[in-house]
């Protein structure tokens, strides 16, 4: 039953009464937050939750997500003993390999599972048949089994979480539509509903497939696309004497199964995916009355899945069909959750569960509640942080292209160094065309085209003898070794124009940066400092270099993918610490950035400038304005590869001229254009760490 009288004030308002919203509310109450209101536009579970398939698998490629899913299982066991059980069934799960490559992946996953204490074991075909007697083993190479995986009824789970939240003091209002979210000084101030206004400090957007619409109320782009996801339920046919079946996944055939009463649920991830939208001009807008509804059946898109299912479980071609479900699920561009505080202070999101929100719901609720209470993540959630998305994802069309590709690759084997092919070419270096004409093999990061390495026409027959076998060697190239050795022995020239560049200025800029940075960064004009940025517990939020370019102006250089994360953290600290005389701006696209490193770097650079580059005149971690071909640019003596060299920051319009001048000057000194794969190899060889990887 919904609480009747809407309060005029609450500390926290949760929008969305699906499994995500109720889990967040449950955990807020569990951690002592009593002043919480949850709102839903219709009934609880009326978005995507009610039609979710209910599978709960724990092991994922991401360690953080694995830990979150493991917590979910612990929570569901606990809820099953409560006054309102969650209908949790610990039936186990099987994954089978229908190819040798998949079997190799399964064996890798068994190794990963051991690091978490998970009971994932390899099983033979006979054991698979014993556990799942309905299976046809044709083409099956082997499989694995995890006894502690299971399934849960999504509506019962949501009900159990909502009941627990209410017992903890949370007030829940259904059939209450949010009309506006109001801000003051870029912070949450109140929520306006069709039943009145609630003054509040924090809003948590748990709107699921509606999350993008809710985000637009505060002009925040949330890159979630509702995708049609289909599955069927058979009539009852499993004899009573058959033990309850574990769930079964056959990713090579794109299908999954679980038992439903005495029948089967069967679904999958088709190669011809389709978004759900209110109109042809919008990719993330849901009809206003789409509550507790499904989409029309699209059997033609499901046909391949059904055929694969009948081959793997032949009875699927014989039994009757009880129900066919086509329900929209919110997907993100990388199939990871979308969590955390946005660019608006106090406006959080917990959505985009990519059809595995039931498995993750317990963990999602826990980490988001902790994040809200602490004001920062309590564990490494970078891969789920909404700030991981670049500004390119403000385009629904760009987002859709990437969502479709990742949806259709959901069950694929993923290899180190693989690249996405969709939504390419959004951001390019000013010398992109030169790279392309000279054999560059491009990768993409945060919607930037970047050179991975070069394959020159004269080097097609590279030495492949060192290529690793199997999974690791899929995207390996001998060209990286050539670039690596050129940098160590002569000089490498790198285009790092995608690096994020943030200008911090104002009367209190130095004071502000010294507050949030672990190192003193106010060392005088033209001094550069490498520093970590710490949270209240001393954890590393980010790391970057800061160059003082004037008395009250600083240039921050950080990773390509970290612009919104790092700029967002700066803005949050400025807001919370009342530094109103500080200005923060993104100047990434104003400057090209080239790195020239190696034993011959000084000789090459000195040939094109009159400025003294000697060690005495231009020491390490110093920065100066110099000229190359009458072009003024900033040169910073720094290295990310462990060799002598400089990073050069050049007005974009002059980028090609400087690049060509350096190549020409270094022709007789062994200079070689190099890509990001060489940077990775070089930095790791020297023990240089990267945030979000080794840090």
Residue ranges and their predicted role:
Residues 54-131, 252-257, 261-265, 275, ...:
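Dinucleotide-binding Rossmann-like beta1-alpha1 core, especially the glycine-rich loop
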Residues 29-49:
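Glycine-rich FAD pyrophosphate-binding loop
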Residues 23, 57, 181-283, 287-296, ...:
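Flavin-dependent oxidoreductases
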Residues 144-202, 210:
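Helical element adjacent to the flavin cofactor pocket in flavoenzyme catalytic cores
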Residues 6-20, 37:
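Beta1/beta-strand and adjacent pyrophosphate-binding region of the FAD-binding site
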Residues 379-380, 386-695:
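Glycine/proline-enriched, intrinsically flexible loops and inter-domain linkers
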Residues 67, 96-105, 144-166, 173, ...:
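Short beta-strand to alpha-helix junction loop
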Residues 154, 261, 279, 292-427:
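C-terminal catalytic lobe of FAD-dependent flavoproteins
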